[in-house]
Structures are given as C-alpha cells and as structure tokens.
Amino acid sequence: MTRRYVNIVLAAALVTAAATNAASAQEVVKVGASFAMTGAGFSAAGRQAVAGARLYMQHHGNTVAGKKIELILRDDAGVADNARRLVQEMIVNDKVNIIAGGITPTVLAYGPLVTQAKLATVVMISGASVTTTASAYFVRTSFILSQSSWIMGEWAIKNGSKRVVTLVNEWAPGTEAETAFKQRFTELGGQIIESIRIPLANPDFAPFLQRIRDLNPDTAFIYFPGTQAGIFAKQFAERGLAGSGIKIIGPGDLTDDDELNNMGDQMLGMVTAHDYSAAHDSTLNKKYVDDFKKANNFRPNFVSVGGYDGMHLIYEALKKTGGKTDGDTLLAAMKGMKWESPRGMMSIDSETRDIIQDIYILRVEKINGELWNVEFDKFAEVKDPLKAKK
C-alpha cells in the first residue's frame, strides 16, 4: 500500500467524518482541544489555556444555541506528531465539530488535517505570526509575539532609547521578537548596535553580559522563555549593570504573571509590552482574576485569556449560526467579531483571521507584597505588524 494511497484514504475519511459531524442533528457540539498538559517547557501554557476555557464555561454555562458544549481535552505534550495523531483521532473517532489549538509546532502540524476536514480551529496558545497562514480554517484568540515586540520598538524611540543591543535565544520566537522590534525601532530612527543570539538550553549569560557592558547601549531588548528572564535580570544586577543606566525592555511574556513572583525582586522596574496583565484595571478582569484564582489556586496569565476568549468566540459564533457547525459558516461568523475581554477590547481581523487588540506598556511593581505588571501606557487596536508589512 503506497503512502499516496494512504493519504487519499485518510483525506476521504476526514472529509466524510467532518461532513457527518456538521450535518447531524446532534444536540452536542464537541470542541476538541489538543494542548500540552505534560512535557518539559509547555505544560504551564496548556494548564493556563484549559483553565481559561473552563472558567468561561463556568461563567456562561455549557449550552448555547440550544446545543450542549462538550470540551474534549487531549494531551499532546507539545509534540507535533502527537498533536497530528490526536486531532485526526478526534475528528474521525470523537466526531468533534471544532478544534482548539495549542502551541505553534503542534498547530502547524495539523493545519492540513483541519483544512481537509473543513473544521473551524480556534488557536488559543500559539503566538507565531505565521500560524494563521497554515490553514484558512485557523482563527486566533491568543497573542502575537510580533505585536508586542513591534510596539516595544515604537515605545522605546518615544522614550529616549537611541542605541540598542538585542539579546534573544536562538529559536523561532526569539528571532521573530527580534525582527519585529528591529523593524519598528530602526524605521523610526533608532540604531541597533549589535544583535546577539544565545543558546536556548541552559545559557551562560556571563559572556553576553560582558559584551553588553563593552558595547554600552542605552537599552537592551531581551527575549527568553520561561524563568530565564529572571536569571538574566539577577546576573545583570549582580554584575553591576543595574546601576549603569542601561534599561532592560522586552515583550511581556518575559514577566509572565504566572511566574513573576518566583523570579524575585530583580524584576522590579522591568518594562515590557503585552496584551494582558492580571493587574488590568477593569470590572471584568477583576472578576476574571478572582474567579480564576479561586478555581485554580494560581494567577492567570496571557495564555489563560486566550482560552477564555477562544470559548467566547466559539459561543458567539454558534449564536450567530443558530448552532450550525460547518467550518465555513462558523468562520464567516467569527470574522470581524468584536468584544470586551478581561484583557480589554479585541476583535478578529476579517482578512487574516488574526487578533486585533490593545498592547499595554507594563512596569513590574510590588503591590501588597506581590509583583505585578502595572500598565502605564497603551497602544490601541494593534494588528499583526509582520502581516501588515507584506
């Protein structure tokens, strides 16, 4: 049996399964979520997205447009091959009507599957600009790394930065953050005096800190995953650079609300740009944070609102379609939708199916003994700048 024959049979099975799912007069709408719930590096994101999605269902019930909503969760451990297999199984065996998407490598892996099956897929975690180009059935409610990095470049110019060193990990998110920041910063007249790339795994910051000292920029734009930002800031202070006048800036997942208090006081004063802070001052967000913490015993972060808003998009689209779940009808209902989220006002770009949202400038401050990302500036209705430039 040839690979081509197997692919043809699989494609036929996917299309048949999806058509059957959409056409049936079922009383249940199944949302199949493939997230990393275990595995190194990505399980925290899966935990946050699921908690956000479940909280939305707690707030709004599990029935919409006369249909019961069932959230089916599968753990792909952040592995692309796992995600592709699990999504295929959910389409064919579980007969899901909608897919909820996770981190970038996994959603890119099953893009062709949901395209063949014509299933609306709400991306709740991935932040790569390229994500929504992988399938015409992808729509995003998470975040876009280039949005915050681009805005950070604009804010830096407006606030006196002229000579900047960029320091990022050698991986796709790091290079995307660097690219977006550099494009905006340089087109507004700033100078990048050096772009430094460092290993992703267990980096030794010492030589890079010395290089920053030697270059003597007024600002360092950095981007590292997880708790590495805290390690960097600690070593930055220990080597006397904190008093050198060099400012540290970066995209907001550097100071992730879920990890911030574990990073320590060396994060105080760090300025970032992001779409969400748990300290966002709105009635809706205060209720969201209180209810989230009661349900989960940890603080919500920017990934959690991707899950919460993802379920909102699904619910509101089903209301508009009267419960119809075929992908084309749902996508048409989702495009252009606008609503108030715990993060603020947001909408779905009708052309790119990407998120349009406010980007906040945040400073780490200590309030009542806890570290928080406190908003002090805002850029309204930001699109994905890397798509807008094309």
Each model region followed by its residue ranges:
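Bacterial N-terminal signal peptides that target proteins for export
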Residues: 1-9, 19
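Extracellular/periplasmic periplasmic-binding protein-like sensory domains
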Residues: 233-308, 319-321, 325, 365-368, ...
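Extracytoplasmic "Venus flytrap"
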Residues: 29-56, 74-80, 103, 167-175, ...
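Solvent-exposed, acidic/polar segments of extracytosolic/periplasmic ligand-binding ectodomains
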Residues: 29, 335-390
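Beta-alpha junction/loop-to-helix N-cap segments that form part of ligand/metal-binding clefts
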Residues: 28, 44-48, 59, 63-132, ...
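Periplasmic-binding protein-like
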Residues: 90, 94-103, 122-124, 165-168, ...
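Extracellular/periplasmic Venus flytrap/periplasmic-binding protein
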Residues: 85, 128-130, 136-239, 276-287
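C-terminal segment of classical bacterial N-terminal signal peptides
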Residues: 15-24
